[in-house]
């Protein structure tokens, strides 16, 4: 019995180490999504002394932006830094998920093998792999949700307030990084109250609530400085203005909600999780306390899915927060099926088969993204823009260019997704928002020494070809400089 167990220990850590290395390499070489760029720009603005909401529009929870800003203050203002720490957080979430199964699954011969399957089912998930290492809050939320789950499971069997308070703090950190993860907070609190086995449940609930509140101190601070701005960025923008950039939003949302049918990974993971949940409820014979932990996975997955599904518009990556919890249930489902079809104490082949299927699904996703834009292309564009733009001159560009050139955007240009917001002028000024008409007026008045765009329609609408003497085309993008006699750029 010693040899296979030692072998599975090596396999457990070996497989997860190989995954972690590959994931880190991907994060530094190819990971990119356009939406991460305004998160990076927000971190850069924070380093310049500006406050989210108060000094610039940033319709996101602020904690992840402060996290990125802190690490960039130590290691430099580079997307490589943000990607590295997001990747490490995602790897941490995968390890927490795999380790939970390896420790808590009641069938000894399946603990380590199932842990490998569960960890790789989560880590090789296409959405987790593609979005986990980005500067957005995905990595932060994956890690804090997985950690809050682990702490909550431990807290119900122990007296005292420390573990519940820590669980609330970590769950609050997830919500403070992205409100898409906020649904986990009431689920964890309710579950701890219902299944508490030691100590005063009300004291624990109070500790959890206080911990959550502590995580929201940055939001409370910003609210005290600008309640109107904070309300707009965290609530009003999402309720009334997000859909401005997505026509036929309802149809789009329905297509996203049905897209799992076309995903082999989602189908496999979901079916295994469903079988796992049924096995826990009807066939396992496990102790009620252990069953409750797996039920918690189901409740978290359901609540987080509902939260992501009600976003308007929603996107497939919003659902990646459920992956660790669905993967745990899928590990149970894999055992339930394999133990009936194959030898119950020989998990090697089922684990290899499922891992291979998830790896193939990820491979297909990465192959389909092979021609997508990435940071290397923007670095070339930023270098040319720096070459032709005088220091401290005004630049008309988008978030990735502002970030890479380290040129602060003019007021109102910090978030390109805000120009369609239609509010009274005084409100727009308070919220640091300018309209598309105001953007056009500034560009055509000669306010910018250099202009950049990758959109032919925008180039024509702004009249950039007639405003500048010089033009350079790089890929699908164009850089304009050397203003004609229409005005001089503002200092």
Enumerate the language-model features and the residues they cover.
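Membrane-interface transmembrane helices that cradle and orient dolichyl/undecaprenyl
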Residues: 104-105, 109, 145-166, 193-196, ...
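Membrane-lumen/periplasm interface segments of specific transmembrane helices
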Residues: 204-245, 303-306, 310, 401
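Extracytoplasmic
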Residues: 60, 180-181, 185, 224, ...
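Perimembrane helix-loop-helix junctions
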Residues: 184-213, 278-287, 328, 334-343
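Hydrophobic/aromatic-rich transmembrane helices and adjacent perimembrane loops
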Residues: 132, 138-141, 146, 183, ...
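Transmembrane-helix motifs of polytopic, lipid-linked glycan transferases
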Residues: 84-108, 124, 147, 151
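Membrane-interface alpha helices of multi-pass inner-membrane proteins
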Residues: 118-119, 161-179, 185-190, 213-214, ...
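Short hydrophobic alpha-helices at membrane interfaces in multi-pass membrane enzymes
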Residues: 112-116, 151-172, 201-203, 292-301
